[in-house]
Structure formats: C-alpha cells, structure tokens
Regions:
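Active-site microenvironment for binding and transforming phosphate-containing groups
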Residues: 1-261
Length: 261
C-alpha cells in the first residue's frame, strides 16, 4: 500500500501553528466502488455510504496517523449547526451538525464531502480554527456565516479561509430551484456576482452551470472574510484523486481537516 499523500492547502495566510489537509481517494483499503479508481484500495472515510465498516475504520486509522488527535466526525445534514469539536467524543452519539470550531490544540475539526464544498477557517492569530460542509443548501442557508460567527464568539480576530475539493463550475448543472435559493437572499449590489455564478446551460432551457466556489466567496465577503484561497480542485473531473457523488452516485467520502498544533 502506498503512503498517504493528502493535499496540503496552498494557503499563504495560514498561521504557522495551524495544520490542515484534505484527503484524496488514494492509498486506502476500500474495494470498488470505493476504491482508488485505478484497481487499488480507496481511502473512503464515510461510514454512511455502503462501504464495509471495517474498511472505513482502517482508512480512518491511516488518516489518524497524520493527525494530532481523533477527527471530530459529524452527522452532516446540509444544515447550519456549528459545534465545538472538543465536545465530540468517542463513545458518544455522533453530533448532528455541518460545521465545527476548535480553540484547543490537538482538537481536529473535520468535514466529509463528495462534491459539496468543504471550507476550512483560521484566524490570523492562530487561536481559533473551523471547518464547514457547504453543499448548496447549507451555503444558501448560511452555514459559512454561522461558522464565522461561532469562531468570533470564541475569540477569533481576522479570519482567512481555504476552499477544498468540490464539484467545479463545468460540472455542476442545477435547475432554477437552486438558483432561486440564492437569488432570493441576494443583497443589494450582488446581481453581477450571481450572474457570474449561474451561467445558462447551452441547449438546456432552465438549467444553469453553478460555480459553488464563487458563491462561497460571495457569502464569505458578506461576513468580512476576504482572504480566501483554494477552489482549484474539481471532484467531478478528477476521478483519479476524488470521489464524486454527481459522477458516480455510489461512492466514498473525502475529508478536509484543520487543527491547532
């Protein structure tokens, strides 16, 4: 088995005392359709997507070897709830939330995705970190704003963010319901940004190609988070590295994680 080689964010603003990474589908033990797409074992980290639990736990152990502590896994529901990752303990019921924050060294915030957008946060003083699962429903409902709010309540100063692997703008076809969910909550002066984020799909009336990275930048800017990086990895087009629900339907889950060292 090859050694894990997760994505280390290209994140110039990340304080030196903060660690962060995003997993790929490579170098795990899961069999098809949760494999690495090349005939080898896949690093599926989701217990809820049909894979053998023993394989998922082994994959999680492989990932844990790179971390200072156990990831605070959540039961994600496309909502806006944010929890303190330090309260997520083994042996307890999994907490229902789509984001977590941490201000204690060694506590690992984690979100799982397979096309939805993972966003990692850190304040520039390295005192508070966070991770959010932002599918279009959670994004429109305000999960990023709630995460920023929770971080500031925990003492964060200026916040920087990194957008991890998600479905890119050439693959994310949506209907008018998705576009309307964002248009209805648009603020004055955001019309141009929304037009850029929802481009009509040629030859498919009523369909749009959505840019979830652009939408996240728009929502983050509302809360004063303008130091935003990432948004360069498309899960749907890079089958060698990423799981994608839109592409494969039955598939594994990736993780994006952040912690204070």
């Amino acid at each position: 088995m090859a050694r894990l080689a997760p994505i280390v964010p290209s994140w110039p603003d990340l304080p030196a005392n903060i660690g962060a990474l995003a997993s790929t589908r490579e170098s795990g033990v899961s069999a098809a359709p949760y494999d690495d797409g090349q005939g080898g074992g896949g690093l599926n980290l989701g217990l809820h997507c049909g894979d053998e639990a023993a394989q998922v736990h082994e994959n999680r152990a492989l990932l844990a070897a790179l971390l200072p502590g156990r990831p605070a896994w959540l039961a994600q529901v496309h909502g806006v709830a944010v929890v303190d990752a330090a309260t997520v303990q083994p042996g307890q019921a999994v907490q229902v939330a789509d984001a977590s924050i941490a201000s204690t060294p060694g506590v690992v915030c984690a979100v799982m995705t397979a096309d939805c957008l993972p966003v990692l946060f850190a304040d520039l003083d390295g005192k508070v970190v966070g991770a959010a699962h932002a599918g279009w429903r959670g994004l429109a409902a305000g999960v990023l704003a709630e995460t920023v709010k929770a971080m500031r309540a925990a003492g964060a100063g200026e916040i920087t963010a990194w957008m991890g692997p998600a479905i890119g703008p050439t693959k994310f076809e949506v209907g008018p319901d998705v576009r309307d969910a964002f248009v209805c909550c648009a603020l004055q002066g955001e019309d141009d940004a929304l037009r850029t984020a929802f481009k009509p799909c040629p030859g498919r009336d009523g369909k749009f190609m959505a840019d979830i990275f652009a939408l996240a930048r728009l929502f983050l800017a509302r809360d004063g988070v303008t130091r935003v990086f990432g948004g360069t990895h498309c899960t749907a087009t890079d089958s060698a590295r990423f799981y994608s629900y839109r592409r494969d339907n039955v598939t594994g889950r990736l993780a994006s994680l952040i912690w204070i060292k």
